[in-house]
Amino acid sequence: MKRRISTIANLVLQQKPKAFYDIGCDHGYLARELVQQNPSLVGVNSDISANALGAAKGLLKDHTNMHFITSDGFDLLPNLNLDPAVGVIAGLGGLKIMQILAQHNNFLKHFVLQPQSNIIELRRFLSANQWTITTETLVEERGFIYLVLAVDKTKAQTQYLTEEQMILGPHLVNFTDKQMLVKYYNGLLKNFTARLNPSQFDSQVIHVLNKII
């Protein structure tokens, strides 16, 4: 978990935020990493689970600039009006991430995302809803490879992804660790080829992945 949290934290801090919103914060490990590196950060830690939020409160009890809110996505989150502010949605499925981003009361323009599934669908959603993917990176931990993305909605030019970019990622194809990249794409290919009744889209994904691996 340490590598993944460190990777997410670095992408958050690169944006030099005054505040962060960890949506689905679980036990608060990301917030701890962030305030260790920048003690002046204001953090809003939210989770649908009151038990998880209680654990986060205990972990961060010495940090007075932390807020803890039981909420499903943005339902009860306050806008602290600190700019820039970065949202984090990590460890959730791509479909749930899409649902949270689409909430009418989403007031954030910068996010770091770490989807557990439905990554291609997430990229399609981002492209269709004026989100620009600025960074894509991979991190390997305990035998699993995780994708982490930074996205924003403040670019003057809207990013429209091609079908191939939705599958491979607009930046991921340039990831420097080619061995990890091929391993990641192979895992994606294995997932799609295992489907019993592949759709036309599934077949297209398989074709694109086979071309690059």
Curated annotation (Swiss-Prot):
Family matches, as InterPro entries: SAM-dependent_MTases_sf (IPR029063), TrmK (IPR006901)
Gene Ontology CC terms: cytoplasm
Subcellular location: Cytoplasm
Molecular function as annotated in GO: tRNA (adenine(22)-N1)-methyltransferase activity
Keywords: Cytoplasm, Methyltransferase, S-adenosyl-L-methionine, Transferase, tRNA processing
The keyword Methyltransferase appears for this protein: yes
One Pfam family in the UniProt entry: TrmK
Matches recorded under SUPFAM superfamilies: S-adenosyl-L-methionine-dependent methyltransferases
First-tier enzyme category under EC: transferase
Transmembrane segments: none
Entry's Gene Ontology BP terms: methylation; tRNA processing
EC assignment: 2.1.1.-
Keyword Secreted: no
Family under the similarity heading: Belongs to the TrmK family.
Annotated protein name in UniProt: Putative tRNA methyltransferase MPN_351
Native source organism of the sequence: Mycoplasma pneumoniae (strain ATCC 29342 / M129 / Subtype 1)
High-level lineage: Bacteria, Bacillati, Mycoplasmatota, Mycoplasmoidales, Mycoplasmoidaceae
